[in-house]
């Protein structure tokens, strides 16, 4: 092994490559092109090809003259840590005692073979009509970055969020002929996946394509059999995909057999479905910054930045949450890795003029660590963010008992308040808390381990620190009887003592603030915003989705046996497009209300999702305007249900509240019109009420349309808000479900 470049030349190339590699948003093909331009100006190389592998800080350039001479440059990482070189020859650097950033290898036929990397194309599916505004995709982005970091494959990403069509996907696959094709199939994407897979397999049968095909994410892992019936040679990733793709590459190289591939399901030669054991991915050590190839295109559609800083959920007892396809243990990135990945994404976002606001995709951002050190971990991350010159914003999700847990000591809760204050100082903009219900009966059925009053206090503590809130709320569940749970939920959502104005705590200790927010009614009254809780509900009027493999699905089955009723429809077979069961309600009237409210949600979903997505990337003035639309929509939705419940169970207080709301919208005649009445709670009567209530929603959206036309708010480059508004107005009075149950 010898060096054929002068020290001066090596330093020059490392400096130039460092500058190119610092542009971490470039696709590998774009990096290779820039490297080729660099070396074309040089007379020191007569190379056959250039290969770029690695990601962010371990990107490596291989300049291949022929099998007898290969130059390797790694300006940011010591080559002694290079995974490809270590696979080739683990002791290649034994005689070297110093860090190595350049090496010329001679007579290296075996290394030459290692540089013949397999090709992998990963496709992120998306139904744009339902989710018009994109975000940095993590499912394929993280898998890609892992393969690149380990220098296992050349990876190309395709993302349907940015308008890529099925025909374009197929053309790309036929042109590039990848060794492995992977599809990420989320809720509601089964039909789209089948459409693409049908075309892929038709080309395989015709001899136009010879790739290994694998699919992953929620829907295939819930029920692989439905995919195998249609595509017997398909390989399904059951859980995390990093090690599965690693092993598929090894299988491609004949280093592993199919039954040795991590976490894969497949049909063996006898026709039996096999499930290989899945090893847990070392998330803390092995998963780098997601690939940022698509970020430039995402920015054109005013998309948002996302990041996952942990995986899993230690609680894992919510009855509606399936855990089989996820792992129960909570595994966070280290503080250093979290800050590094945040910096990578923010730097790339800045290049594309995406505002420095990151939406954390963690199931539970706070989590639990041995010896209760999770709060200190968050404080350390926040201290790191506070050292940044450029301030950022970030959103994340947490459990209510990560904020306030009455079963814990006062010291524990005060320490949590300190942690949340650090989050506020570091840029926490909005926290999603899975409140889910204001009814203690429902909370028990949901397995939340919290109470309605505990949830109120949690919201109070966080909002007092100036952090905005968003909550999950499951209004309806199939086992609720009568209207009591609904009334409790409506009362909870109308409470105005949960959301606080930001409080200056400069003159207070954390303990003093904690005591006041729990026990001082006068202090609470003075500092509350007066806004009701329904203004922060993420999706109003939502119903329980009974997903496969959940405790709640087993609760329904137990109720069927105990009460001798049939609740799960379709002969007990699930709707595989959404991985859920079509289930009747124990109480038929509640079932009618639930279905109608879901139609209300779906009728507004496209336009409200677009508004919410634009809100994420808007400037402060537009952000305020867009959020006002969201609040008004939530209020209209809340009072729709209140009116429906009032019709079924009238009371004087509700009549007064409804009268005030309707008068504000010049619709007070509804209360006195016997034709606009739920009557016996039939679906027809409920939809009749909703059609009239939709006139209130139309007024809101006409205001949105006017503001858009005046330039008060800004649309995406391809006018997605304009298009969703146009679609909404044309569909007025038509009630249907976006993802209706697939019944066989």
Curated annotation (Swiss-Prot):
Requires OxsA for the oxidative ring contraction activity. Activation of OxsB requires its direct interaction with OxsA and is independent of OxsA phosphohydrolase activity. In contrast to ring contraction, methylation does not require the presence of OxsA. Its EC number is 5.3.99.13. It is an enzyme of class 5 (isomerase). Residues 119-259 form the B12-binding domain. GO terms for molecular function: 4 iron, 4 sulfur cluster binding; cobalamin binding; isomerase activity; metal ion binding. It catalyses: dAMP + S-adenosyl-L-methionine = 4'-phospho-dehydrooxetanocin + 5'-deoxyadenosine + L-methionine + H(+); AH2 + 2 S-adenosyl-L-methionine = 2 5'-deoxyadenosin-5'-yl radical + 2 L-methionine + A + 2 H(+); 2 5'-deoxyadenosin-5'-yl radical + 2 dAMP + A = 2 4'-phospho-dehydrooxetanocin + 2 5'-deoxyadenosine + AH2. The keyword Cytoplasm does not apply. Disulfide bonds: none annotated. Cob(II)alamin binds at residues 135, 139, 184, 241-242, 308, 322, 325-326, 361, 363. It comes from the Bacteria. [4Fe-4S] cluster binds at residues 313, 318, 321. InterPro entries: Cobalamin-bd, Elp3/MiaA/NifB-like_rSAM, OxsB-like, rSAM, rSAM_horseshoe, Tetrapyrrole_Bchl_Biosynth_MTs. Residues 299-545 form the Radical SAM core domain. Keywords: 4Fe-4S, Cobalamin, Cobalt, Iron, Iron-sulfur, Isomerase, Metal-binding, Plasmid, S-adenosyl-L-methionine. S-adenosyl-L-methionine binds at residues 436, 545. Binds 1 [4Fe-4S] cluster. The cluster is coordinated with 3 cysteines and an exchangeable S-adenosyl-L-methionine. Its cofactor is [4Fe-4S] cluster; cob(II)alamin. Contains four domains: an N-terminal domain of unknown function, a Rossmann fold that houses cobalamin, a partial triose phosphate isomerase barrel AdoMet radical domain and a C-terminal helix bundle. Isomerase involved in the biosynthesis of oxetanocin A (OXT-A), a nucleoside analog with antitumor, antiviral and antibacterial properties. Catalyzes an oxidative ring contraction of dAMP, forming an oxetane aldehyde. In addition, shows methyltransferase activity in vitro and is able to catalyze the radical mediated, stereoselective C2'-methylation of dAMP to form methylated 2'-dAMP. Also catalyzes the demethylation of S-adenosyl-L-methionine (SAM) to S-adenosyl-L-homocysteine (SAH). Belongs to the radical SAM superfamily. This is 4'-phospho-dehydrooxetanocin synthase. It comes from Priestia megaterium (Bacillus megaterium). The lineage of its organism: Bacteria, Bacillati, Bacillota, Bacilli, Bacillales. The gene is oxsB.
């Amino acid at each position: 092994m010898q060096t054929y470049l002068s020290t001066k030349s090596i330093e020059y190339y490392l400096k130039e490559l460092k500058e190119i590699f610092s542009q971490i948003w470039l696709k590998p093909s774009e990096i290779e092109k820039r490297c080729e331009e660099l070396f074309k100006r040089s007379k020191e190389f007569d190379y056959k090809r250039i290969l770029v592998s690695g990601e962010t800080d371990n990107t490596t350039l291989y300049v291949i003259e022929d099998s007898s001479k290969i130059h390797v440059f790694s300006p940011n990482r010591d080559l002694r840590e290079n995974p490809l070189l270590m696979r080739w020859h683990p002791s290649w650097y034994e005689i070297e005692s110093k860090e190595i950033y350049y090496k010329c290898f001679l007579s290296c036929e075996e290394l030459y073979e290692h540089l013949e990397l397999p090709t992998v194309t990963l496709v992120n599916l998306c139904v744009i009509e339902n989710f018009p505004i994109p975000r940095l995709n993590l499912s394929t982005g993280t898998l890609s970055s892992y393969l690149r970091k380990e220098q296992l494959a050349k990876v190309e990403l395709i993302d349907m969020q940015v308008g890529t069509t099925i025909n374009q996907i197929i053309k790309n696959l036929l042109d590039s002929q990848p060794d492995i094709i992977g599809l990420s199939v989320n809720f509601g994407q089964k039909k789209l996946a089948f459409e693409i897979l049908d075309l892929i397999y038709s080309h395989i049968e015709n001899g136009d394509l010879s790739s290994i095909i694998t699919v992953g994410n929620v829907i295939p892992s819930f029920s692989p059999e439905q995919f195998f019936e249609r595509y017997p040679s398909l390989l399904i990733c059951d859980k995390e995909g990093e090690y599965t793709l690693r092993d598929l590459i090894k299988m491609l190289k004949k280093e592993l057999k199919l039954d040795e591939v991590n976490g894969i399901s497949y049909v063996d030669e006898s026709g039996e479905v096999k499930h290989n054991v899945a090893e847990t991915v070392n998330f803390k050590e092995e998963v780098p910054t997601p690939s940022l190839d698509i970020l430039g295109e995402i920015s054109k559609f005013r998309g948002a930045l996302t990041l996952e800083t942990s995986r899993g959920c230690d609680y894992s007892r919510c009855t509606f949450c399936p855990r089989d396809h996820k792992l129960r243990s909570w595994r966070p990135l280290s503080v250093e890795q979290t800050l590094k990945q945040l910096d990578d994404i923010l730097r790339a976002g800045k290049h594309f003029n995406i505002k420095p606001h990151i939406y954390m995709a963690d199931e539970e951002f706070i989590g639990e660590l041995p010896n209760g050190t999770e709060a200190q971990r968050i404080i350390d991350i926040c201290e790191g963010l506070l050292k940044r010159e450029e301030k950022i914003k970030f959103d994340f999700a947490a459990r209510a008992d990560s904020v306030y847990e009455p079963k814990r000591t006062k010291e524990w809760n005060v320490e949590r308040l300190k942690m949340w204050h650090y989050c506020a100082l570091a840029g926490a903009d909005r926290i999603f808390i899975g409140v889910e219900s204001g009814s203690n009966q429902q909370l028990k059925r949901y397995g939340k381990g919290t109470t309605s009053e505990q949830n109120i206090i949690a919201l109070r503590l966080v909002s007092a620190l100036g952090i905005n809130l968003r909550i999950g709320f499951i209004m309806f569940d199939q086992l609720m009887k009568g209207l009591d749970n609904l009334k409790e939920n409506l009362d909870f959502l109308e409470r105005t003592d949960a959301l606080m104005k930001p409080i200056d705590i400069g003159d207070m200790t954390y303990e003093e603030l904690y005591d006041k927010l729990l026990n001082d009614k006068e202090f609470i009254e003075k500092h509350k915003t007066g806004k009701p809780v329904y203004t922060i509900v993420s999706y109003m009027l939502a119903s329980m989705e009974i997903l496969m493999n959940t405790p709640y699905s087993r609760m329904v089955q137990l109720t069927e046996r105990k009460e001798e009723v049939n609740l799960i429809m379709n002969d007990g077979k699930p709707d595989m497009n959404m991985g859920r069961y079509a289930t009747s309600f124990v109480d038929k009237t509640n079932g009618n209300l639930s279905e109608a409210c879901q139609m209300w949600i779906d009728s507004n979903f496209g336009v409200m999702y677009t508004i919410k997505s634009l809100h994420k990337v808007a400037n402060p003035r537009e952000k305020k305007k867009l959020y006002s639309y969201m609040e008004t929509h939530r209020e209209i939705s809340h009072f729709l249900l209140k009116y429906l419940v009032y019709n079924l169970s009238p009371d004087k207080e509700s009549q007064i509240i409804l009268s005030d709301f309707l008068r504000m919208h010049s619709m007070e005649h509804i209360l006195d019109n016997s034709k606009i009445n739920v009557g016996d709670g039939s679906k027809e009567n409920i939809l009749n009420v909703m059609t009239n209530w939709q006139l209130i929603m139309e007024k809101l959206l006409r205001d949105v349309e006017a503001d858009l036309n005046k330039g008060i708010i800004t649309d995406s480059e391809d006018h997605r808000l304009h298009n969703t508004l146009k679609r909404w107005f044309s569909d007025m009075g038509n009630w249907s479900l976006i993802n209706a149950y697939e019944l066989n």
